[in-house]
């Protein structure tokens, strides 16, 4: 392709992604766009086509982003190349959204005609505006009985400042308004900028591992041209590789001669280690490198940590391999080895939030066949010791003794909740109970209120979202962002079984709630841990002080069942023998702890 062809091609490229709150019909709209541009054979079409994981289809959510190239014959007679980059909608996967947006010039903002704007819609709009993207507003599901497109149009104008006239009304399910959306993409989304003659600059926005071909990186070319045979260099790591193949997704992978300015495709360069092709890195030519890497990609740090332990110890190395493979596609997943007296060897693993944690656990069990025990999640606490030293603690078992600590800081988040008027009281009460600090409240319209609180992250990660949903009959929507670490009066609570600490059950709690949480947990453990042949005391302790205690009664075993009549001394001898055996068993302290017991720490608020 010569210089002029590249310039001509560039003006007909449109790169866009679809952003929406979870369940507003984003994946269905992506399906309709694929269908209407005849990108997929009718026989290959299935719902949620771009959601390639079984888990995504089952839960009906998008977890991984996906990029696909489409051809569209517009009414002006020109043929346009669309690159659609599908994004997740759940708050935990904001980093996936920020990656997609960095590779686009425009975004279709999908809003449900019945639900209206929700908390995550706003969060994604702000992300899009940060990336200077053109917004194309679409009100979806207009054929629902409860749809109120005019009210939602007004909302878009009042809350986001979008002109009502620019809004497209559609129903992805019934294929209404899809043609208007395609025409609007041509009109609203600007063609990519960039010089095909300049040194190569390409953004890696996703990567996956293929056992035969190595790492396959999804890229968006910002400047220059890349083709097979080129020697490339990663700007963050300085590593060099030779390109073996470049191609596009249609949604199937298809190799092409070259990728030039504005193209979204994939690149394979015999990269064996995922760390060498990091998401957010810039690719350039080794011989003629670009001066500076691309800006605009945010590294997401894990917010929630938990221990993952294989039920069978011999799976330890397989678990490491599984985590490494998942980390390939998931730049925000972090892990390091840890050992626990109760659970043996495993990994302390960091996630973006609770849904992220659940999904990673489920993928390890499904895709790699490793059965896991997971400990209750915790967040990172900063401790300033009396010696002046500063320590970060992501595992409650490693918290220094209270008498050595000067101050403890815990992470706080700004939580934005959109709630119907009738439930404002219940939501505010929930936030106060979770140690929240009221910041602001504004009425969006006659029906809904936007409430903002600052809440400790440790209170949010447990079951805040579930409780918010149940307190509002499922109508609330929720989004949060990390703001800062703040000083808190926290203590570490240990759980003792049979007089021995179980490190995997330790947790950190606010001093004010220590007694009631300790009491709730020991009562819960009493019901979850099976009865042993001897009585087992369950205690909750803060430092040396026991704050709550209960006993798991022993299982009665009738050793006299085979004694029919006979001498009383014979019976006494059998009972003495049983007593000695129980004492020995108790000394060893082998209490079987089921997985539910470790998760009980999570569910303490539900009773």
UniProtKB/Swiss-Prot annotation:
Molecular function as annotated in GO: GTP binding; GTPase activity; ribosome binding; translation elongation factor activity
Subcellular location(s) per record: Cell membrane
Domain tr-type G: 11-193
UniProt cross-references to Gene3D superfamilies, sorted A to Z: 3.30.70.240, Elongation factor 4, C-terminal domain (3.30.70.2570), Elongation Factor G (Translational Gtpase), domain 3 (3.30.70.870), P-loop containing nucleotide triphosphate hydrolases (3.40.50.300), Translation factors (2.40.30.10)
SMART domains: EFG_C
Chemical reaction(s) catalysed: GTP + H2O = GDP + phosphate + H(+)
Chief localisation class: membrane
Swiss-Prot/TrEMBL keywords: Cell membrane, GTP-binding, Hydrolase, Membrane, Nucleotide-binding, Protein biosynthesis
GO biological process, one term: positive regulation of translation
Keyword Cytoplasm carried by entry: no
Similarity annotation: Belongs to the TRAFAC class translation factor GTPase superfamily. Classic translation factor GTPase family. LepA subfamily.
Family matches, as NCBIfam families: lepA, small_GTP
Stored PANTHER family: TRANSLATION FACTOR GUF1 HOMOLOG, CHLOROPLASTIC, TRANSLATION FACTOR GUF1-RELATED
Protein name: Elongation factor 4
Organism whose genome encodes this protein: Staphylococcus saprophyticus subsp. saprophyticus (strain ATCC 15305 / DSM 20229 / NCIMB 8711 / NCTC 7292 / S-41)
Taxonomy of the source species: Bacteria, Bacillati, Bacillota, Bacilli, Bacillales
């Amino acid at each position: 392709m010569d210089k002029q062809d590249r310039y001509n091609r560039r003006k007909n490229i449109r790169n866009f992604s679809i952003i929406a709150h979870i369940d507003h019909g984003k994946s269905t709209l992506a399906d309709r766009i694929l269908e209407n541009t005849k990108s997929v054979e009718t026989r290959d079409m299935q719902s949620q086509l771009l959601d390639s994981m079984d888990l995504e289809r089952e839960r009906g959510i998008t977890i991984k982003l996906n990029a696909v190239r489409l051809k569209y014959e517009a009414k002006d007679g020109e043929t346009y190349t669309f690159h659609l980059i599908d994004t997740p909608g759940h708050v935990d996967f904001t980093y996936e959204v920020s990656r997609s947006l960095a590779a686009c010039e425009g975004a279709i903002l999908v809003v449900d005609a019945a639900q209206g704007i929700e908390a995550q819609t706003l969060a994604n709009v702000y992300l899009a505006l940060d990336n200077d993207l053109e917004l194309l507003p679409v009100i979806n599901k207009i054929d629902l009985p409860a749809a109120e497109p005019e009210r939602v149009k007004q909302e878009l104008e009042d809350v986001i400042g979008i002109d009502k006239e620019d809004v497209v009304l559609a129903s992805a399910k019934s294929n209404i308004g899809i043609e208007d959306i395609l025409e609007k993409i041509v009109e609203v989304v600007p063609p990519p900028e960039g010089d095909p003659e300049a040194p190569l600059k390409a953004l890696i926005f996703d990567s996956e591992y293929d056992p035969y071909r190595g790492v396959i990186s999804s890229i968006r070319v910002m400047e220059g041209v890349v083709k097979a045979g080129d020697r490339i260099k990663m700007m963050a790591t300085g590593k060099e590789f030779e390109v073996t193949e470049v191609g596009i997704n249609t949604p199937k992978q298809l190799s092409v001669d070259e990728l030039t300015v504005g193209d979204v495709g994939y690149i394979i360069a015999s990269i064996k280690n995922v760390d060498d092709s990091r998401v957010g890195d810039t690719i350039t030519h080794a011989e003629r490198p670009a001066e500076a890497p691309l800006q605009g990609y945010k590294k997401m740090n894990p917010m929630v940590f938990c221990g993952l332990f294989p039920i069978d110890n011999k799976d330890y190395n397989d678990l490491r391999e599984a985590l490494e493979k998942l980390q390939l596609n998931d730049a925000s997943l972090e892990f390091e080895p840890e050992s626990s007296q109760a659970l043996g060897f495993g990994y302390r693993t960091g996630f973006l939030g609770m849904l992220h944690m659940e999904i990673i656990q489920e993928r390890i069990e499904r895709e790699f066949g490793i059965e896991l025990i997971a400990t209750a999640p915790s967040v990172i606490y900063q401790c300033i010791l009396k010696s002046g030293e500063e320590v970060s603690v992501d595992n409650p078992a490693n918290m220094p003794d209270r008498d050595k600590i000067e101050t403890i800081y815990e992470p706080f988040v700004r939580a934005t909740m959109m709630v119907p008027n009738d439930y404002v009281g219940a939501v505010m009460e929930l936030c106060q109970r979770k140690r929240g600090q009221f910041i602001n409240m504004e009425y969006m319209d006659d029906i809904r209120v936007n409430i903002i609180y600052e809440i400790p992250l440790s209170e949010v990660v447990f079951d805040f979202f579930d409780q918010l949903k149940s307190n509002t009959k499922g109508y609330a929507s929720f989004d949060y962002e990390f703001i800062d670490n703040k000083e808190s009066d926290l203590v570490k609570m240990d759980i003792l079984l049979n007089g021995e600490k179980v490190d995997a059950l330790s947790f950190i709690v606010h001093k004010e709630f220590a007694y009631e949480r300790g009491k709730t947990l020991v009562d819960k453990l009493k019901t979850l841990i099976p009865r042993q042949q001897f009585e087992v005391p369950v205690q909750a302790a803060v430092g040396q002080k026991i704050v709550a205690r209960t006993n798991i009664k022993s299982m009665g075993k009738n050793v006299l069942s085979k004694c029919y009549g006979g001498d009383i001394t014979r019976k006494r001898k059998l009972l003495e023998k049983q007593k000695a055996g129980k004492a020995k068993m108790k000394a060893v302290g082998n209490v079987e702890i089921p997985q539910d017991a470790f998760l009980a720490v999570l569910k303490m608020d539900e009773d």
